[in-house]
Amino acid sequence: MSLSSLISLTTRNNIIGIYNDNEVQIVFLDTPGIHKPKQQLGKEMNNMAYSAAHDVDVAILVVDASKPFGAGDQFIIDHLDIHKTPLIIVFNKIDLARLDKAEELKATYRAIFKKAIFIDTVAKEGFNIDTLIKTVKELLPEGPAYYPTEMVTDKDEIFHIKEIIREKILKQLSEEVPHSIAIYIDNIEWEHKPVQIFASIIVEKESQKGIVIGAGGKRIKEIGSQARKDIEKLLKQHVFIDLQVKVDADWRNEPLSLKTYGYKYEK
């Protein structure tokens, strides 16, 4: 449902993913990672996550088992009120963790969340995801299905087009620049064949503009080419994509810009 990247804090919105089988409908709500914010964007992301945590029947806390417990983990525990909600703690990337270090990490969480259920996973390989689904089923209260069975997410095509473009940028650039990038869809000509997509890549500094474009425009052409392929899979038709890079200074701290780019938390 959301983009994947080795760079942290890439999920910026609450995203619903809908699971259906012959027994149940499970609505998963993927939230931005809770963190100590440096800009208003980070505060908005945290607010989305805090709000979601209060509105769920089961909370799932995903922990990177390959990394030791740190200040960021403690920050999440201190700020996320999930002690009254049935809790599953998922230790993902368990295949990359040393056994003794993984047990040490689990002991830390077990001391804090005494009633939590622990599940090891390797999400990328699908390992133990069936156990996670089974456990969620057992914890959920009975109720009506909220969405049609053919729905897999609450997000529309424009949202996914933006996320595809952003994902390709993340794969092309270093750690610092991607956090200051937003995507704005200027126009989509749906009636045109192929579909015409005009999008702006928003950066905060003039120097970042050149980094995104690359020497002779090589990088932005590659971003556009990779994005086009995935967007065509999404829309199941050919598309033309035009990408422009624009500067919006300090947009991560500007309320109007945050709202324009879809990152303003609304209660």
List the model feature ranges, each with a label.
Residues T85-I88, D95-E157:
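Canonical P-loop GTPase G-domain recognition
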Residues I18-N22, P37, A52, V56-A59, ...:
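Conserved, well-folded catalytic cores of nucleic-acid-processing
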Residues M1-V24, G70:
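Switch I (effector-binding) loop of TRAFAC-class P-loop GTPase G-domains
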Residues S8-T10, P32-H35, A65-F69, I94-A97, ...:
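Conserved nucleotide-binding/hydrolysis micro-motifs of P-loop NTPases
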Residues E157-K267:
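P-loop NTP-binding site
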Residues Y19-Q25, L29, E44-F118, E189-P194:
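Conserved C-terminal guanine-recognition region of P-loop GTPase G domains, centered on the G4
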Residues S2-S5, I34-G42:
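Flexible beta-alpha connector loops of hexameric P-loop NTPases
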Residues L9-R12, G42, N46, A53, ...:
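Amphipathic alpha-helical transducer elements in NTP-driven molecular machines
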